Amino acid sequence: TDLVTNPMDYLNPAHPLLLISFGRSGNSPESVAAVELANQFVPECYHLPITCNEAGALYQNAINSDNAFALLMPAETHDRGFAMTSSITTMMASCLAVFAPEMINSQTFRDVADRCQAILTSLGDFSEGVFGYAPWKRIVYLGSGGLQGAARESALKVLELTAGKLAAFYDSPTGFRHGPKSLV
């Protein structure tokens, strides 16, 4: 969304650009506007939309464009839930597989899935919350640099999955100690 509100902070007409767009539906006004702005301001602009919706604008525009290649996720990942858990996971994993195939491939995906299943099995019954029934009211995720986005997305998922009943925040570790730590 920052790209749409401040395009010249991110788009440099003097350098080629590969814009990677993640969009479950591929129809959000921000996603479509980001593509249009990139095409408008950057002469050598290429697009890689990663989406779960074959009928979405991101996918349809890409298949009809000379400067785009779309990655369409399986239809089963086009989840309808507000938190988009399967779609974002599949889109992110697919992006990693495209840009780091020697590190992320079907075998590593299988290994991760097996490890996750082993962890879930070892944790036992989830009928009681992960932290018991403590009256938690807020959670803060910390991340800086490349992990700031993960902290932001984690906070958003908690907010969505609890329907706002648990206040979720994010910050950088050093930024958190200057005021926001008063949350805890």
Predicted features and spans:
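Active-site phosphate/pyrophosphate-binding segments
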Residues: 63-184
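Glycine-rich phosphate-binding loops that contact phosphosugars or nucleotide phosphates
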Residues: 1-114
